[in-house]
Amino acid sequence: TEGRTRGLALVPKLALDVMACEVLRALQLTDGFLVPISYVVPRKSLQEFHEDLFPDCAGTTPAATAQAWWAGDSEQVAKVSLHPARRPAEPFTSPLVPGARWVDDAAPGAGLPDAFPADGDRSGSGYSSPSSSLASPGSAATSLSASTGPSSGFASSPSQKSLQSILGPSSRFRHAQGTVLHRDSHITNLRGLSLTTPGESDGFCANHERVALPLLSAGGQITVLELSRPGRLPDTAVPTIQNGTAVADLSWDPFDARRLAVAGEDAKIRLWRIPEGGLRDTLQEPEAVLRGHTEKIYSIRFHPVAADILVSSSYDMTVRIWELGAGQDVLCLRGHTDQIFSLAWSPDGKKLATASKDGKLR
């Protein structure tokens, strides 16, 4: 793509175009553009859902409250299917379809399109169950001979087996191809991006609905752009978040697409609530302000399992875990003797790792 890369972010799996076999989408931030890059695994058919490419992933409902997590609750975030017909949907009614209603207690697969089989419908073709499909004697004989005959072509030869034992199993993603999406999906005419965001920060962050970008303007301004509204930004000023101080790091709440946490160089963390549908006016008052660090903050991360839990690291050599409902830090980890480059939760949320300038991983 054109221009120097200023940052990269991954779009959550729930926003992928699974029926096009899109397995990954990255957002590339350049000096004047936000460019989506799609990675697709080629498949002959795009009329059915390929379950081997899309295992169930973590949903957007927290597994525990902050209080339950502190009490030792080890529940994990429930997995959800990426199959379009199996995702939770809001009840839908239309005046154009009299009497249309949502049936919650329907049998599995009831009312689903043929292209989207239910969980219990896992035949080879993906369209009919074994109990309802009929085959002629000739086709059955052909199938039997194809599966048992020595020249069927389905059995691996000794040389193939030995090669597989040496190389190991091949990846289903080995033919994935990355493509820059059409310009109609780009966000262009970005202006005044911050070039001074610390190296410990990712520079910008994204969720499945929007992205947040720090600006060079005084007062730590942040612009929030809706991914559903690509195109050229106006030459005039756009609504922003007035953070009040330079941005050190920022992060979206994984369980609330409208809550943005921003760490500032004034040692405070501000929580901002984005209006439904995106920014229309400049925001000046945060939802909450977290105070506890005594020096500039390095980085912040939301907990991957429990709601309202945030961790931060600072130049004061401490790592603090915050309970957002209470608005205060409930645990302060000391022991670092040098700069903390980064920190990360384990996927199950039970462990926290930090990387430090002294070469130690804690």
State where each predicted segment sits.
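WD40-repeat beta-propellers
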Residues: 1, 11, 27, 222-226, ...
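WD40/WD-repeat beta-propeller blade N-cap
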Residues: 2-3, 194-196, 241-247, 290-297, ...
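Acidic and/or Ser/Thr-rich intrinsically disordered tails and linkers
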Residues: 15-233
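Loop/turn segments within WD40 beta-propeller blades
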Residues: 204-208, 251-257, 300-307, 344-349
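Conserved strand-to-loop turn within each blade of WD40 beta-propeller repeats
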Residues: 215-217, 263-266, 312-316, 355-358
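Blade-loop segments of beta-propeller domains
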Residues: 231-260, 286-288, 295
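Short C-terminal beta-strands that terminate individual repeats in beta-propeller domains
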Residues: 237-242, 279-292, 313, 329-335, ...
